[in-house]
Amino acid sequence: MQYFWSMELLKKIMDSQPDIRFTDGSLAIQRARMVKTPWEIERIRHVCRITEQAILETGKTIVAGETTEKDISKGIAMRMARGGVDKISYLTVTSGIDKYCTFNTYATDRVVQKGEYVLVDISGHIDGYASDLTRVFYLGTVPREEREMAMTASGCVAAAKEAMKPGVS
């Protein structure tokens, strides 16, 4: 979240208080917000669990040659709302070779096909705490070479997680 005052309002406040020195505290606030309490961590985990469950349950309903990107998007949004999510910042569902490198696009009436990937990128919120998940489904049996690439990517993610420690940014 970002909070900004208009320049006009800030000038009025500063003019009305000539003996007070105003200092930009946004960096200090940003740093303080990076540290989460156990309660905040649990809120984030909670919304992530709901988001993950909505994606997985919807993924089980995908039928190649029948399901559209919009069907997938609606299914995820409905399940998230049922789970208690009060806001969805974005919900991207893309499929088909022409859209593999296209992020943050709206779901279309395009029917997903066997042998394709379906990418879901979503952020849901509960009480101001957000999830941010990306998941990929493959419709059919993943080819060997692509499984190997996925395993390599998974190893990179595991190494990055291992390197993460409190205080490291």
Language-model features, listed with the residues they occupy:
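Active-site neighborhoods and metal-handling regions in enzymes and metal-associated proteins
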Residues: 1-169
